[in-house]
Amino acid sequence: MSDNKTSLSYKDAGVDIDAGNALVDRIKGVVKRTRRPEVMGGIGGFGALCELPTKYKQPLLVSGTDGVGTKLRLALDLNKHDTIGIDLVAMCVNDLIVQGAEPLFFLDYYATGKLDVDVAAEVVTGIGEGCIQAGCALIGGETAEMPGMYEGEDYDVAGFCVGVVEKEDVIDGTKVAAGDALIAVGSSGPHSNGYSLIRKILEVSNADLNEELNGKTIAAHLIEPTKIYIKSALKMIAEHDIHAISHITGGGFWENIPRVLPQGTKAVVDGSSWEWPAIFNWLQEKGNVDTYEMYRTFNCGVGLVVALPKEQAEQAVALLNAEGENAWVIGEIAAAEQGEEQVEIR
């Protein structure tokens, strides 16, 4: 190497290995708190090891991946990063419960232009809290510092979850039949969907995020973390004959409920069976959003829709409410003609 040339380092290129190591040290306690007995070893290896729980006779693995969309931009604008990790876990594990799966382990991907250890630690601490709520282990992840790919300290996150279900107990919608009852399980707010529309509404209405609505600021309503349904849903599944579960995410009622319905059936939803949480009425008014578009974009207060035999509905609602959920009968399954829409909201 020539003496008159500057010696370049990875840090000169914008990647701080020491910061990455500091983050790993900060989150070791978070990972430890999520540990399950099936997990072998700790973080830092090239791969993570996890045994299958011994209680399963014919275990099927169920996997899922998701992000939190442009809710991240809201978190960045508010400089509030401690709950976005809960959102990330929720979006993944709530998809697994649709098939009756118990989440086993979770991995995260955190990418940024310049690693802020404090912000990243807040995000991962939220991921750990989400894993605790879901009963799954945080067994690894990737932190990618990529200068030139992201603006400043902006970041993006993705989650990956694997769960397990007994083969004979998979919930796949094939048992859904006309006459089944539909149960709604309430959401905590918009969860992690529709935020591009939310941000557009905020822009065109020039809304004040510090405005109060039912005792909370608009900002607090919008950043409220996604509800994790795992523990209450698993208990419901254990005690009732669940025919289908739909996680109401992007696409709202119109897109998500048909995903779990067999041909020849439709969900008839009683729109008068619940009142939308105030934040949805506020969004509709501020954005002059059509009701059809609201149901197509947002969960409108419903996080899960569950199909089960009508005679079991009231008991299932009571169980869910005893577990701390807000559940109610929202409608029923009816026969559908060929080509008919599979969701009807009356």
UniProtKB/Swiss-Prot annotation:
This is Phosphoribosylformylglycinamidine cyclo-ligase. Its EC number is 6.3.3.1. HAMAP family: AIRS. GO terms for biological process: 'de novo' IMP biosynthetic process; adenine biosynthetic process. Belongs to the AIR synthase family. CDD domains: PurM. Keywords: ATP-binding, Cytoplasm, Ligase, Nucleotide-binding, Purine biosynthesis. Pathway: Purine metabolism; IMP biosynthesis via de novo pathway; 5-amino-1-(5-phospho-D-ribosyl)imidazole from N(2)-formyl-N(1)-(5-phospho-D-ribosyl)glycinamide: step 2/2. GO terms for molecular function: ATP binding; phosphoribosylamine-glycine ligase activity; phosphoribosylformylglycinamidine cyclo-ligase activity. It is found in: Cytoplasm.
